[in-house]
Amino acid sequence: MLGDSVTTDHISPAGNIKKDSPAGRYLQEQGVEPKDFNSYGSRRGNHEVMMRGTFANIRIKNEMLGGEEGGNTIHVPSGEKLAIYDAAMRYQQEHTPLVIIAGKEYGTGSSRDWAAKGTNLLGVKAVIAESFERIHRSNLVGMGVLPLQFVDGQTRQSLNLTGHEVISIRGLSDGIQPHEILEVDVKGPNGVASHFNVLCRIDTLNEVEYFKAGGILHYVLRNLIAG
């Protein structure tokens, strides 16, 4: 659960790797000394490091933790505080797909491809935000992550979303269309159910095909295999 102006550097930092971060722990397990960690940017060819670095920026604020800075979150339903990577891996073991909820201008800043790649590798299937930066929106679709936009002036605050809800998105199996209005079902931790509408920010028919294939790389490979 993120706020406004979440940048691609918040999502996929390029700075130094902390010793006690998921990426730092991984490198030490591979026999790399902390003095040789270097930066995320220098290791962008290593998906194991980069996926562990996704949402690991020390300045990112997760509203599930009251706006506390750092790449942590709350695992639902256990309530355990974990690094975002560690929580994502637990959710994958539990076969739970993930949704990010955010405010305005999601994905601003430099066009960093790992911001979308890492999001996909963590098991995120959709991002619901008030607005998206143009290139990052396109990159999300290209990685098979669905960008959805609040409508009718609604926000995470007006809908009283906390990040502890179970989110279900209707209509995805029916053949999604550009700029389609989709319905989101919400079940709160107290069992109370509600719903709201979102605008599908898949903007073109080509993007529909990329998304249906699971991303642009899958789309290209399937076309090559098909002849």
Model-identified regions with their sequence ranges:
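Fe-S-dependent hydro-lyases/dehydratases of central metabolism
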Residues: 1-227
